[in-house]
Amino acid sequence: MTKRALISVSDKTGVVEFARSLTARGWEVLSTGGTFQALQEAGVSVTQVSDVTGFPEMLDGRVKTLHPAVHGGILARREPQHLSQLEAQGFGTIDLVCVNLYPFRETVARGAPDPEVIENIDIGGPAMIRSAAKNHSGVLVLVDPADYPVALQDEVSGSERRRLAAKAYRHTSEYDAAITAYLEGASEELPTRLPERLTVDLHRVAQVRYGENPHQPGAVYRWGQARGPVMDAQVVAGKPMSFNNYADADAAWSLCQELAAQEDGAVCVAVKHANPCGVAVADDVRAAWERARDADTLSVFGGVVAVSRPVDFQAAQAMRGTFLEVLIAPEVTPDAVEWFAEKKPDLRVLVAAQASGVSVLDVRPLTGGFAVQERDTRPWDDLCPEVVTARQPTDQEWADLRFAWATVKHARSNAVVLARGGVTVGLGAGAVSRIWAAERAVANAGDKAQGAVLASEAFFPFDDVVRLAAQSGVTAILQPGGAKRDPEVIAAANELGVSMVFTGSRHFRH
């Protein structure tokens, strides 16, 4: 009995050669639409599916293969009872289904209007793929051109058929997830930002050497059609990105962009292990880098740096003496790229991509599941800062408090930041007590604490941080407030002549 293959693909990579190889082995090839035309024009012997079903394609191609002659031929078990039923209807078996789906993701990604996107939701394709995958013991299902050679083997093992079936179901499930994400995103009235069921469409975009540590495999995945500034950045110089490089660069860029939105100058952010270690604003990138570097010359070694403005030759040269893992910027001039490639060949130099379609959700892994929340993107302008002390902050202190507040939001809790004149002078992050974070920040600042401001991402349970800050020369403090001992904390600030501002907004980061 002649074997039959149904081929209907949007991605026509290698399909002509594949179909020609099948016919050379005695297969009959069935096809539809554009695939039929492509095979026919290439001189491949091919039969139109409508000749098998006895019905023409309908509704502008929306109905082509949704017919018992197709699905019966795919789903029939290769046993007498099913085969006799096919024969009674005049249907034959279909032994191979080669289908990949309408380019839905690509249509969304290029910003097509909604009617065009909807038209690129494939119906017949997923139905055939799922039918073939269900009956994989008798039908080969191919959704990836890389698997075409498998079908040309004399025998295909049961385990290989099962692998192809699993791949097929993954293909359709990812496709459905992309459609779900689009329709939910396009809806003006979502029932909730955190639905009862959350479908996540992830596909791998980068394979890294390993994860956080050499014994952990690692990779980078895209969520739906989102484009990320780091994930999709152009690497213009240096080595391939590592897992930790991606994480740190994303943390640095996130803080850099938040500060750039509220500051007038060029912003530079240095990050180590996802925590800021030097942050500064200045008139130009070179000056901002030098201020951020000098904020903590020890910690910036081996760090990741993000800047808010283009990096030119002068800024590049200023980085000569510091070992860095990654530099990310909105633009890097050609002479700077050339200099980095020659003088710092191991430094990964990235031009950030324009972010789009980014989820508002922040997803954290748990054993057996995930904890999901909305990202903390609250801007300063959403706050209602309240001065709770007799002494009011000066204009410069207000500017520094705002700068320190944005920075401390991006540090791991417990966190305290000291800043003065648009640069961090002391940071304490990841501490298990508030006072320890403050002690670390003060020690980091040294004499630079004199005249600085202090910001904390959460309230003070006691007045110890206020007393330490005042003793170190800090003149203004910003914190959320809301502790039981707020009156004692305020009294200590008044006693010591320190300004204190409550924001009413906590910013834990774990």
Swiss-Prot record:
Tell me the keywords, alphabetical order: Hydrolase, Multifunctional enzyme, Purine biosynthesis, Transferase
Q: Which SMART domains match?
A: AICARFT_IMPCHas, MGS
Keyword Heme present in the record's keywords: the answer is no
Which GO biological process annotations does it have?
'de novo' IMP biosynthetic process
GO cellular component terms given for this protein: cytosol
Molecular function in Gene Ontology: IMP cyclohydrolase activity; phosphoribosylaminoimidazolecarboxamide formyltransferase activity
Outline the extent of the MGS-like domain: 1-143
Pathway(s) this gene product operates in, as recorded in its UniProt entry:
Purine metabolism; IMP biosynthesis via de novo pathway; 5-formamido-1-(5-phospho-D-ribosyl)imidazole-4-carboxamide from 5-amino-1-(5-phospho-D-ribosyl)imidazole-4-carboxamide (10-formyl THF route): step 1/1; Purine metabolism; IMP biosynthesis via de novo pathway; IMP from 5-formamido-1-(5-phospho-D-ribosyl)imidazole-4-carboxamide: step 1/1
| Signal sequence, start to end | none
Tell me its EC number(s), please: 2.1.2.3, 3.5.4.10
What the entry lists under Gene3D superfamilies is as follows: 3.40.140.20, Methylglyoxal synthase-like domain
Q: Which reaction does it catalyse?
A: (6R)-10-formyltetrahydrofolate + 5-amino-1-(5-phospho-beta-D-ribosyl)imidazole-4-carboxamide = 5-formamido-1-(5-phospho-D-ribosyl)imidazole-4-carboxamide + (6S)-5,6,7,8-tetrahydrofolate; IMP + H2O = 5-formamido-1-(5-phospho-D-ribosyl)imidazole-4-carboxamide
Q: Transmembrane region positions?
A: none
Q: Which family does it belong to?
A: Belongs to the PurH family.
Q: What is known of its domains?
A: The IMP cyclohydrolase activity resides in the N-terminal region.
Name of the protein described by the UniProt record:
Bifunctional purine biosynthesis protein PurH
Organism placement in taxonomy: Bacteria, Thermotogati, Deinococcota, Deinococci, Deinococcales
Q: Which gene encodes it?
A: purH
